[in-house]
UniProtKB/Swiss-Prot annotation:
This is Photosystem I P700 chlorophyll a apoprotein A2. Gene3D superfamilies: Photosystem I PsaA/PsaB. Belongs to the PsaA/PsaB family. PsaA and PsaB bind P700, the primary electron donor of photosystem I (PSI), as well as the electron acceptors A0, A1 and FX. PSI is a plastocyanin/cytochrome c6-ferredoxin oxidoreductase, converting photonic excitation into a charge separation, which transfers an electron from the donor P700 chlorophyll pair to the spectroscopically characterized acceptors A0, A1, FX, FA and FB in turn. Oxidized P700 is reduced on the lumenal side of the thylakoid membrane by plastocyanin or cytochrome c6. GO terms for molecular function: 4 iron, 4 sulfur cluster binding; chlorophyll binding; electron transfer activity; magnesium ion binding; oxidoreductase activity. P700 is a chlorophyll a/chlorophyll a' dimer, A0 is one or more chlorophyll a, A1 is one or both phylloquinones and FX is a shared 4Fe-4S iron-sulfur center. It catalyses: reduced [plastocyanin] + hnu + oxidized [2Fe-2S]-[ferredoxin] = oxidized [plastocyanin] + reduced [2Fe-2S]-[ferredoxin]. It comes from Chlamydomonas moewusii. Chlorophyll a B3 binds at M663, Y671. Its EC number is 1.97.1.12. One of its GO terms (biological process) is photosynthesis. It is an enzyme of class 1 (oxidoreductase). The lineage of its organism: Eukaryota, Viridiplantae, Chlorophyta, core chlorophytes, Chlorophyceae.
Length: 735
């Protein structure tokens, strides 16, 4: 008999008489493939419609950011003095605040308690030409309307008349053209337009708004140089080194330049360089989006491109033959590729946001820089682990050995032992040697002979930095040699600005590196390779291994196949993902520790502290972690509190959540099942309490679910703890 209970998408689960119904229902809510009566066409339609919901949420969120800053922030005051005014994210109202808390949180010129923004939105909005609260409100209302449009579009595409067909979803060439030209290309062109027409004039003290944007020329010659082919005119007369951002003082007329380096006052990339960059991307992508064959019978067919990719000698198999259908028919493969790309790009954003700051005055807001770097690195880690998870699901659910005979996928599976054992060798080598060096150095420090430490200069990395123009090492190579071909070729175009930037201590582009950097670099390499080993092994063994050849029949996540086979626990693809996330968090911990400590030393003008203490483990524990957590450990005491008290509490609370995770990770379900049965007995025997009864019989979580719950607590606690540490230690030092 059909039941109306949750989950509606699975009658089997809905009829389960235990609490398993709820937890399994939540676990498979997004696994559309497994839902009752799901067809391939319906699967694609559901996912397509959900994308609109995702976009609606994103636009609503950004709209909310704009709205709260316009309503409760101090954007107009901040614009007048970005160096000294602290940007306000929003007001705080809390009935628990005592007088000291109200005073501590009343900052940035506000009349009551507020949160300080560390997201960089003030710098971003200022750079792109916003100046007033009215600008922010207008943007907020516009984005809220866009959000509503996307919600409607999502609903519309679930209606029978507006649901695209399966063939439409499988039309790879049309989708590529649309995404390349339509999304990447045209949006980059639109952004160039905004920078040229609004942001650059505002940076030169000329307001452009809805009232005058059609009559204000972004360049004195208008479109004449474009039509006449004299494009160089747009690069002539750029802003000078003495340009005061936001005013006409020292400003020029150029709109598309190749100056290199940073604006001396704001320490951010030149707006005219960024406009040029986006224009170039727009041209490339709009051209790229016309390469694939659709309606007119011209252009490339992806299947033909892939089938032609066969190694010429014949000794390397069938190359990319069969890949078109394999990728085009597997959503997990496509998602894996997308996540791998987006994850890599997100990590690159983390690196670029501090080394090449695009937003005015971001370089002097140290807390925001640290927060943005850490935020993007953590997100990159989770996304990249997800790429391998979906790669493994592809191998279990979608991979067809017959359709991929001898091609690159089949060959990777055939060579998996070699791949996995090489990764294992690399991790062992990196781990033992790096730890060996650190521990040796610790022992030398402990025994009072620091001069006996093994300190290795990263000469290859310094050589690469010198080639890019860093002169401090005295290598006299390529761009660091004024007479080299590389230097003379770019001297009149982009080099003066770049060379000034790379050798200037005002920014953190190409940091000077030494033995401490060499060691932590290899520690991070160990973390990356170990994470990769676990993920790659999980995906390549997902279909089966010598130990368990029929593994794919058990699905993505199974605890084990009973006691009879011996040793089939902990080898599902999900278990590999689960283990890899711990290593990912561990690695990103080292990455963010390195970034943060290196920058704290630079920002304080005390690089010797990092250089001397980073070569041994006690240095990291004592001079980075302990020294910088002192304010948090003493956060609120009998003598009062301060604006860091909330972070001190968050630091404590993060540890608590993290520790709770181990309760799920170290015990198995038998313990909990016994405990639950005892509690059920007590409940049934207690007068009054036993009047209340449950519809679902309480049972313990499954092994797989408990691992997930433990992992989530571990991850959330880990991130809360480090976020509190990072923001408090940075803002406590620099205000």
């Amino acid at each position: 008999m059909a039941t109306k209970l949750f989950p509606k998408f699975s009658q089997g689960l809905a009829q389960d008489p235990t609490t398993r119904r709820i937890w399994f229902g939540l676990a498979v809510a997004h696994d559309f493939e497994s839902h009752d009566g799901m067809t391939e066409e319906n699967l694609y339609q559901k996912i397509f419609a959900s994308h609109f919901g995702q976009l609606a949420i994103i636009f609503l969120w950004t709209s909310g950011n704009l709205f709260h800053v316009a309503w409760q922030g101090n954007f107009e005051q901040w614009v007048t003095d970005p160096v000294h005014v602290r940007p306000i994210a929003h007001a705080i109202w809390d009935p628990h605040f005592g007088t000291s808390a109200v005073e501590a949180f009343t900052r940035g010129g506000a009349s009551g308690p507020v949160n300080i923004a560390t997201s960089g939105v003030y710098q971003w909005w200022y750079t792109i030409g916003m100046r007033t609260n009215q600008d922010l409100f207008t943007g907020s209302v516009f984005l809220a309307l866009v959000s509503a449009v996307f919600l409607f579009a999502g609903w519309l595409h679930l209606q029978p008349n507006f649901q695209p067909s399966l063939s439409w979803f499988k039309d790879a060439e049309s989708r590529l053209n649309h995404h390349l030209s339509g999304l990447f290309g045209v949006s980059s062109l639109a952004w160039t337009g905004h920078l040229v027409h609004v942001a650059i004039p505002e940076s030169r003290g000329r307001h452009v708004g809805w009232d005058n944007f059609l009559s204000v020329l972004p360049h004195p010659q208008g479109l004449a140089p474009f039509w006449s082919g004299n494009w160089a005119a747009y690069a002539q007369n750029p802003d000078t080194a003495s340009h005061a951002f936001g005013t006409s003082e020292g400003s020029g007329q150029a709109i598309l330049t190749f100056l290199g380096g940073f604006h001396p006052q704001t320490q951010s990339l030149w707006l005219s360089d960024m406009a040029h960059h986006h224009l170039a991307i727009a041209v490339i992508f709009i051209v790229a989006g016309h390469m694939y064959r659709t309606n007119f019978g011209i252009g490339h067919r992806l299947q033909a491109i892939l089938d032609a990719h066969v190694p010429p000698s014949g000794n390397l198999g069938a190359g990319h033959k069969g890949l078109f259908d394999t990728v085009n028919n597997s959503l997990h493969f496509q998602l894996g590729l997308a996540l791998a790309s987006v994850g890599t790009i997100t990590s690159m954003i983390a690196q670029h946001i501090y080394s090449l700051p695009p937003y005015a005055y971001l370089a002097i807001d140290f807390t925001t820089q640290a927060a943005l770097y850490t935020h993007h690195q953590y997100i990159a880690g989770f996304i990249m682990c997800g790429a391998f998870a979906h790669g493994a699901i592809f191998f279990i659910r979608d991979y067809d050995p017959e359709a991929n005979k001898g091609n690159v996928l089949a060959r990777i599976l055939d060579h998996k032992e070699a791949i996995i054992s090489h990764l294992s060798w690399v991790t062992l080598f990196l781990g033992f040697h790096t730890l060996g060096l650190y521990v040796h150095n610790d022992v030398m420090q402990a025994f009072g002979t620091p001069e006996k430490q093994i300190l290795i200069e990263p000469v290859f990395a310094q050589w690469i930095q010198a080639a890019q123009g860093k002169t401090v090492y005295g290598f006299d190579l390529l761009l660091s040699s004024s007479t080299s071909v590389a230097s003379t070729a770019g001297q009149s175009v982009w080099l003066p600005g770049w060379l000034d930037a790379i050798n200037n201590n005002q920014n953190t582009l190409f940091l000077t590196i030494g033995p401490g950097d060499f060691l932590v670099h290899h520690a991070i390499a160990l973390g990356l390779h170990t994470t990769t080993l676990i993920l790659v092994k999980g995906a390549l063994d997902a279909r089966g291994s010598k130990l368990m050849p029929d593994k794919k029949d058990f699905g993505y996540s199974f605890p084990c196949d009973g006691p009879g086979r011996g040793g089939t626990c902990d080898i599902s693809a999900y278990d590999a993902f689960y283990l890899a996330v711990f290593w990912m968090l561990n690695t990103i911990g080292w990455v963010t520790f390195y970034f943060h400590w290196k920058h704290l030393a630079l920002w304080q003008g005390n690089v010797a502290q990092f250089d001397e203490s980073s070569t041994y483990l006690m240095g990291w524990l004592r001079d980075y972690l302990w020294l910088n957590s002192s304010q948090l450990i003493n956060g609120y005491n009998p003598f009062g509190m301060n604006s860091l008290s909330v972070w001190a509490f968050c630091f404590l609370f993060g540890h608590l959540i993290y520790a709770t995770g181990f309760m799920f990770l170290i015990s198995w379900r038998g313990y909990w099942q016994e405990l639950i049965e005892t509690l059920v007995w007590a409940h049934e025997k207690t007068p009054l309490a036993n009047i209340v009864y449950w519809k679902d019989k309480p049972v313990a979580l499954s092994i797989v679910q408990a691992r997930l719950v433990g992992l989530v607590h571990f991850s959330v606690g880990y991130i809360f703890t480090y976020a509190a540490f990072l923001i408090a230690s940075t803002s406590g030092r620099f205000g």
